[in-house]
Amino acid sequence: MAAAAGNTLIIHPWNPTNKLIKEDDVMKIFDTMGIASKISIQDLSRYQKAFVHSSYVEATANQALSNHKKVLFSACPSDCLPFQDESYENLEFLGDRVIELCVVWYLYLRFPM
């Protein structure tokens, strides 16, 4: 949602339903997969980062604004999640590399030259 204040466009991107995932939520996901008893959450912030889309990152939001003149974000309400520092993309990249390594290792062992 956006509003005009004089020559400045003020954007209201805040959504009170955006929340960081909680440990209970993570464990429910693991429970549906039948692995909750085998998992111990050591660092909840990693799981929370895994659910942050790149469009909800501070740098991305500010970059989008820099393409326009006189555009501002409204203040983040106390019941809303502020923009985050990082998205899940770095974790996704690392996960992709782990899967790639596993597949390549399997193929190497399965089909030796």
Predicted regions and their residues:
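Double-stranded RNA-binding/processing signature
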Residues: M1-M113
